[in-house]
């Protein structure tokens, strides 16, 4: 029988002491090949099945055939059968299997340090292949353009290895290695770092496995399984509390060993943070509301309506664990983890005397007497002692490594841990205590170490008016933003809640929050960008509702194409992370499992190559605004998208989803109507259509357009109607037919307008009853055309919540005085609806009714230019349009009487490329304030203070950049992200 000899560097005796009640398997683990024969291959086969609604299933019973399962049900059935078999034939300890099924979640096994190229090199030596042969070249150079595309297994390194191994296998039948034996050998492999130590381990696998087993082994080593099911599905089927426990511990071992019996639920006390176990922290909610509404959403206590205002730090979210341990010099052991559960203890130190620790060696006096153990939540930032100011996030790791080499430098950049919460103190979890109580415990436990470990400060707010001065300060200091916190709230693990809210300043010409989109396609460039991918197709992942209906969780809708804002290093970085994973786009066999384009068979914006979302990268993209587009599957895209940065801390699962974007868009539109200072946003419940004027009734959202599938059947639900006459236009319907139509769509029919409250009167011609209602003048009379328009619009919006379109003047047979003005606001000056798709006939009449304008004023010309630029992508590539729509203000140094030569050259260059130049800083249209690269810090600070006054005026804030932004953008032939060119002060 297999025995667990070593897990995560611990002996079996140590594990027995740590987990005395862990389950023991009664029999040997299953053969390794059973993993792919009974689990991986069936799951992959299920991925290839066409998806469809679960409703289209055969019925069970004496007259029904065998039930046809939906792909999602079949996926669960495959996993359930494997788990049931394991429990029956092996035992309750499924940890050995889960380590190989979801290896990317196994934190107990060290990283192998083996990437594709290294494995290819080792296989060439093990199989004694000539490195210059076709197979040798393909293994060693699999990333080279053209090589991977020639293979049937293109983009799949493990599949490439399978092809090569299949030509020279030692075994053709499956081997007899068990799952536990494979785990034992992988533990040995993880403990090695030299080639001469790695080769014997891989040679043993080669001798005892056939090509298919080796292919799956390589996928396990690379942690790239692609089995058509996420860890969430495995966790849900294993135990109902498995995902919750993993969220608070990030420990696959705890999930398997503490939750082996599905009938024994996790106790509340067990679902708490634990020392030296990485948890998933609480996150701040994005909101786009006016300040009073944000405070309202925090649901502050009437007895204590105060809230806290903290500066949002530009660093990395880190949790610090400290406990007493006599085996560590100094008696205290430390652990550091990121939000994504990456262990950074090696970087910041495991004890007071860790010579490699960039932080812990400075913390000997950081804790109050009596603190034996503690868990702190905070932000690790980079601090520059010379400027006595924080530096951008991208410099953090460099600063930490520099601190390791020279720990007592007084001038070098260093990591600084700013603490804003405490979760655990002296064996007691504090998550259920209020933030105010936790802060008291934090301040009593920590003795700050200047510019090494500090408690993050906060301001107390009593009303919305207290937020604005703090936001002005943030702008003046070029900080990230603010976080508002409810001091009476508990700590909510792995949750994003209104108790904490982000507030970011909204800058000119940008659409609120950055969009983190997964790359799904690529387009080859021309000219100076020829020979490589120059622009990328980004998508939005589908939501849970579509997954439940059978869609692949990885499926993405095409959303935007971005080719601006990239520098040569940016392209190189993306290439590094995606080389070898691209596949040629085959129009006859599009990858519909992963990507859905607009246009059906026409395949609008079809990329040259595509990539699986789980092998791709996430780009942070900024844009000017959202605009309708039939070229992208979402029905929407963004104007002037620009690359901001590569989000290596995110993957396809955490990239923006369709619903998340629609929520973001709805919030942006709602706040656009308010005359208050606006902030960045993210999540709400319902997305609304972009409109020209404020609406009182929600309109139609083109972004979620669905094909015609008939009336939704609920559009008039909860409404009362009194149909008085038949219909003549646009359809001839009798009174009875109109009543049937209303009832079929959820409405109720009455034969008088006084029988039920809020009854709508429907009529199109004058009768005695119509005249009677009209004479009383208490009820408006609506034409039947409104019924038809509502039903038709909801057919177009199939799949969205049913919404009524607002009344238009054309819908009204008679309007009471109190409603006339409101209804008139639902159309523009030409009677074009803001919320409804008009028909071609209506559009034709509308155009005829418009007066001719022989001479267009400048604003109209500018608007036309913008529309041309939006529709013609080639205009964006013209250097003469590079700074179009940008308004720049150039600031001379206080010691100069006129602009310096570099500033004048930059100004001329920007104007040549389409920019406008504003002479006064007070100009409301300014998008960028440009200064010289050698401006003095005092001048920069003064300028930021002046710009911050825009906050009080409720205006957006211009970017503050050096002339390098203009120069480098001109060289790159693309507008680059402004944050890279912000001056330091």
Curated annotation (Swiss-Prot):
GO terms for cellular component: DNA ligase IV complex. Coiled coil: none annotated. Mg(2+) 2 binds at residue 480. GO terms for biological process: DNA biosynthetic process; DNA recombination; double-strand break repair via classical nonhomologous end joining; nucleotide-excision repair, DNA gap filling. Its cofactor is Mg(2+). The active site is at residue 312. Residues 1-27, 43-70 are annotated as: Disordered. It catalyses: ATP + (deoxyribonucleotide)n-3'-hydroxyl + 5'-phospho-(deoxyribonucleotide)m = (deoxyribonucleotide)n+m + AMP + diphosphate. InterPro entries: Adenylation_DNA_ligase_IV, BRCT_dom, BRCT_dom_sf, DNA_ligase_ATP-dep, DNA_ligase_ATP-dep_C, DNA_ligase_ATP-dep_cent, DNA_ligase_ATP-dep_CS, DNA_ligase_ATP-dep_N. PANTHER family: DNA LIGASE 4. DNA ligase involved in DNA non-homologous end joining (NHEJ); required for double-strand break (DSB) repair. This is DNA ligase 4. The lineage of its organism: Eukaryota, Fungi, Dikarya, Ascomycota, Pezizomycotina.
């Amino acid at each position: 029988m297999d025995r667990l000899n070593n897990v995560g560097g611990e002996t079996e005796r140590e594990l027995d002491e740590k987990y005395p009640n862990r389950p023991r398997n009664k029999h040997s683990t299953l053969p390794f090949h059973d993993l792919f024969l009974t689990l991986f291959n069936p799951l992959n086969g299920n991925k290839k099945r066409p998806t469809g609604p679960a409703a289209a299933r055969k019925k069970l019973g004496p007259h029904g055939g065998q039930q046809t399962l939906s792909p999602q049900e079949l996926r669960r059935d495959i996993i359930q059968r494997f788990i049931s078999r394991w429990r029956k034939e092996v035992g309750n300890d499924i940890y050995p299997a889960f380590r190989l099924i979801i290896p990317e979640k196994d934190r107990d096994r060290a990283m192998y340090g083996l990437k594709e190229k290294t494995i290819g090199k080792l296989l060439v030596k093990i199989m004694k292949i000539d490195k210059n042969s076709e197979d040798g070249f393909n293994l060693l150079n699999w990333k080279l353009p053209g090589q991977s595309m020639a293979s049937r297994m293109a983009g799949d390194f493990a599949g490439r290895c399978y092809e090569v191994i299949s030509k020279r296998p030692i075994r053709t039948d499956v081997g007899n290695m068990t799952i536990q034996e494979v785990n034992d050998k992988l533990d040995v492999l993880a403990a090695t770092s030299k080639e001469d130590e790695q080769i014997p381990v891989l040679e043993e696998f080669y001798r005892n496995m056939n090509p298919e087993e080796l292919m799956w082994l390589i996928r396990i080593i690379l942690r790239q399984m692609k089995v058509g099911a996420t860890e969430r599905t495995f966790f849900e089927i294993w135990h109902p509390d498995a995902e919750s426990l993993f969220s608070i511990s990030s420990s696959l071992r705890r999930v398997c060993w503490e939750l082996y019996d599905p009938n024994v639920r996790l106790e509340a006390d067990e679902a708490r943070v634990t020392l030296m176990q990485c948890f998933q922290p609480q996150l701040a909610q994005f909101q786009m509301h006016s300040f009073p509404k944000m405070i309202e959403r925090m649901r502050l206590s009437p007895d204590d309506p105060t809230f806290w205002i903290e500066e949002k730090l530009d660093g990395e979210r880190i949790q610090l664990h400290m406990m007493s341990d006599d085996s560590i010099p100094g008696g205290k052991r430390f652990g550091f983890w990121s939000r994504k559960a990456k262990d950074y203890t090696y970087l910041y130190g495991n004890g007071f005397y860790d010579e490699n620790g960039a932080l812990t060696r400075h913390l000997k006096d950081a804790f109050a007497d009596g603190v034996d153990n503690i868990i702190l939540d905070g932000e690790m930032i980079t601090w520059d002692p010379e400027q006595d100011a924080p530096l951008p996030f991208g410099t953090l790791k460099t600063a930490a490594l520099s601190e390791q080499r020279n720990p007592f430098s007084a001038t070098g950049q260093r990591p600084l841990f700013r603490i804003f919460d405490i979760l655990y103190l002296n064996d007691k979890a504090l998550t259920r205590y209020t933030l105010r109580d936790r802060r008291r415990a934090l301040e009593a436990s920590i003795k700050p170490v200047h510019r090494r470990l500090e408690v993050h400060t906060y301001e107390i707010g009593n009303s919305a008016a207290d937020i604005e001065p703090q936001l002005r300060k943030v702008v003046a200091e070029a900080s990230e933003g603010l976080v508002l916190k409810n001091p009476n709230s508990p700590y909510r693990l792995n949750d994003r809640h209104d108790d904490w809210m982000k507030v970011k300043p909204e800058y000119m010409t940008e659409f609120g929050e950055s969009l983190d989109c997964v790359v799904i396609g690529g387009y080859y460039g021309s000219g100076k960008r020829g020979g490589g991918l120059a622009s990328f197709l980004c998508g939005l992942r589908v939501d849970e509702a579509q997954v439940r209906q059978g869609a692949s969780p990885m499926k993405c809708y095409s959303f935007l194409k971005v080719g601006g804002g990239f520098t040569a290093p940016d392209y190189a970085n993306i290439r590094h992370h995606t080389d070898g994973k691209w596949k040629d786009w085959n129009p006859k066999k599009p990858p519909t499992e992963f990507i859905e384009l607009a246009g059906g068979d026409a395949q609008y914006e079809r990329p040259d190559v595509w990539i699986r979302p789980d092998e791709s990268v996430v780009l942070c993209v900024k844009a000017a605004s959202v605009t309708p587009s039939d070229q992208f599957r979402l029905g929407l895209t963004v104007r002037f998208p620009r690359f901001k940065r590569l989000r290596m801390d995110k993957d396809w699962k955490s990239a923006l989803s369709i619903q998340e974007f629609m929520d973001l868009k709805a919030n942006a539109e709602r706040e656009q109507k308010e005359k208050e200072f606006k902030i960045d946003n993210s999540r709400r419940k319902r997305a609304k259509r972009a409109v020209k004027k404020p609406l009182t009734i929600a309109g139609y959202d083109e972004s979620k357009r669905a094909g015609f599938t008939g009336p939704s059947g609920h559009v008039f639900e909860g409404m009362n109607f009194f149909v008085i006459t038949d219909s003549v236009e646009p359809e001839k319907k009798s009174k009875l037919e109109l009543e049937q139509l209303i009832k079929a769509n959820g409405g109720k029919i009455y034969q008088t307008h006084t029988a039920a409250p809020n009854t709508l009167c429907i009529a199109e011609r004058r009768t005695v009853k119509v005249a009677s209602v009209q004479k009383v003048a208490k009820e408006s009379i609506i034409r039947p055309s409104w019924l038809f328009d509502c039903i038709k619009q909801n057919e177009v919006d199939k799949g969205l919540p049913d919404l009524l379109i607002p009344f238009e003047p054309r819908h009204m047979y008679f309007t009471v005085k109190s409603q006339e003005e409101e209804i008139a606001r639902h159309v523009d000056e030409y009677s074009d609806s803001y919320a409804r798709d008009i028909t071609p006939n209506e559009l034709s009449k509308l155009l005829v009714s418009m007066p001719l304008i022989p001479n267009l004023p400048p604003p109209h010309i500018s608007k036309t230019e913008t529309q041309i630029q939006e529709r013609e992508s080639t205009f964006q590539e013209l250097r003469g349009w590079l700074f179009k729509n940008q308004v720049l203000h150039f600031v001379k140094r206080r010691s100069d009487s006129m602009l310096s030569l570099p500033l004048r050259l930059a100004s001329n260059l920007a104007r040549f490329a389409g920019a406008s130049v504003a002479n006064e800083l007070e100009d409301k249209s300014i998008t960028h304030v440009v200064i010289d690269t050698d401006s003095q810090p005092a001048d920069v600070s003064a300028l930021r203070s002046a710009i911050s006054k825009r906050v009080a005026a409720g205006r957006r804030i211009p970017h503050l950049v050096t002339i390098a932004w203009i120069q480098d953008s001109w060289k790159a032939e693309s507008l680059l992200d402004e944050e890279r060119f912000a001056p330091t002060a």
